[in-house]
A protein has these predicted regions:
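Hydrophobic membrane-insertion alpha-helices, especially the h-region
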Residues: 10-26
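Alpha-helical segment of the N-proximal tetratricopeptide repeat
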Residues: 30-58, 67
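Structural register within alpha-helical repeat arrays
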Residues: 35, 48, 68, 113, ...
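Residue-level signature for tetratricopeptide repeat
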Residues: 38, 71, 116, 148-149
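Structural motif corresponding to the intra-repeat A-B loop/turn of tetratricopeptide repeats
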Residues: 42, 75, 120, 152-153
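Alpha-helical repeat scaffolds
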Residues: 49-53, 78-95, 122-134, 155-170
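Flexible helix-coil transition and linker loops at the boundaries of alpha-helical arrays
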Residues: 54-58, 90-106, 172
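Terminal, low-structured helical/coil segments at or just beyond the last alpha-helical repeat
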Residues: 157-193
Length: 193
């Protein structure tokens, strides 16, 4: 009698473990972001970001890309912020603004991408994203932030990248362009390039 009860309990526990493992496995295969939400609530942002990355690779939808960039920022994963923030802010700019109807949020993603590239030492990409994701040199956007970053760090290399990008590309900056040009000229005079 005891052996039958113990055997039944063991079979039941093994069955529950197998069923739970199958449920998690199927959910991971079908919708990684569902499991990512669990890791987010637990505070494990790195794992959640990787799961959101899997979700984005499956769907390539802008909404999944937004969630991936947000989670990468929460995880402070500069490589993922740079890679996917670039896609979001440069390639999907119109879609992003339309989807969120919040240009300030878009600017936050752009600034995070600029900072990530800067931390990774990819200053040319840092400058490119700032220029391409901004239509103006106005306080609060990534282009303005780039110049502030350059000033605060007194980064000659970054200033030179800004100068080269501005001279090489006929950018679409209209609003605040004269103020921006003064800053570029000041960098040229200060650092002598």
């Amino acid at each position: 009698m005891k052996k039958t009860i113990i055997k039944t309990v063991i079979i039941t526990l093994v069955s529950i473990i197998i069923a739970a493992s199958l449920a998690v496995g199927i959910t991971l295969a079908v919708s990684p972001k569902t499991i990512g939400k669990v890791f987010t609530k637990c505070g494990n942002y790195d794992t959640a970001a990787k799961l959101y990355e899997s979700q984005y690779k499956k769907t390539e939808s802008v909404s999944d890309l937004i969630e991936l960039v947000s989670m990468s920022i929460a995880a402070d994963n500069d490589e993922m912020i740079a890679k996917y923030g670039d896609k979001l802010t440069v390639n999907y700019k119109g879609n992003m603004i339309l989807m969120t109807s919040d240009e300030e949020q878009f600017d936050n993603y752009s600034k995070a991408t600029v900072v990530a590239y800067y931390k990774l030492g990819k200053k040319e990409d840092c400058v490119r994203v700032a220029f391409l994701s901004s239509g103006a040199y106005t306080e609060g956007n990534s282009l303005y932030y780039l110049f502030r970053l350059c000033d605060n760090k007194e980064d000659k290399d970054l200033a030179e990248e800004i100068y080269k990008y501005d001279k090489k590309n006929s950018n679409a900056i209209v609003e605040g362009k004269s103020e921006m040009q003064k800053k570029v000229k000041a960098y040229k005079e200060k650092y002598g390039f």
